[in-house]
């Protein structure tokens, strides 16, 4: 069975034949599925059909009808609010005595359509659920907009909504070596290594920037021993780069001070 709070009901035939006003709105409501046929309203309507009633002068039918309902106890439907020509609120309540009632449900009529008013619990539940879903979607969006890279030193944010992306790690990784190479080019002096006859010294030279030479480990050991065991306590900073007793001579390399080193 369909829930009553999801139903919209109307009767075009009744509206076309009799119209809709405050005097007959309860009768119109009694045709809807929201109406309780065991209510006091149904009892009075059955009595009015078979009994002749006299309405006091200056009293409308719905006022007289509701005054009769106040004399009874049980379930009843009354007009709680009126805003003619197209809005009424019908209230279902349980009357305990002429002065005390307990509200059970409200219904409202807009134009010719009858609706069941939602409960406060349902309204709050719906609003809270919508709020939680919105917060969840926002959190997911924030998670999609951030990424963590060790090279960046933390989180970076990307505006994925507009499809733009930034790669600071790559740009910085490219720019830093270029600046380092620039400084190296400005201060490095090209060196050409010279290998003495009978010696084999593999080397790799790239554009005059960096030089890597493989020399037998025994040569370095000899040089280190000469420095450490020297009776004059000479430090390595005092050994000349070129000439007699120089580092190049101890390594078994020949060099020209003006032109550099050569194999």
Curated annotation (Swiss-Prot):
Its main location: nucleus. Residues 164-200 have a biased composition (Low complexity). Residues 159-205 are annotated as: Disordered. InterPro entries: Mediator_Med6, Mediator_Med6_fun, Mediator_Med6_sf. One of its GO terms (biological process) is regulation of transcription by RNA polymerase II. One of its GO terms (cellular component) is mediator complex. It holds the Pfam family Med6. Keywords: Activator, Nucleus, Transcription, Transcription regulation. It is found in: Nucleus. GO terms for molecular function: transcription coactivator activity. Belongs to the Mediator complex subunit 6 family. Component of the Mediator complex. Component of the Mediator complex, a coactivator involved in the regulated transcription of nearly all RNA polymerase II-dependent genes. Mediator functions as a bridge to convey information from gene-specific regulatory proteins to the basal RNA polymerase II transcription machinery. Mediator is recruited to promoters by direct interactions with regulatory proteins and serves as a scaffold for the assembly of a functional preinitiation complex with RNA polymerase II and the general transcription factors. This is Mediator of RNA polymerase II transcription subunit 6. It comes from Candida albicans (strain SC5314 / ATCC MYA-2876) (Yeast).
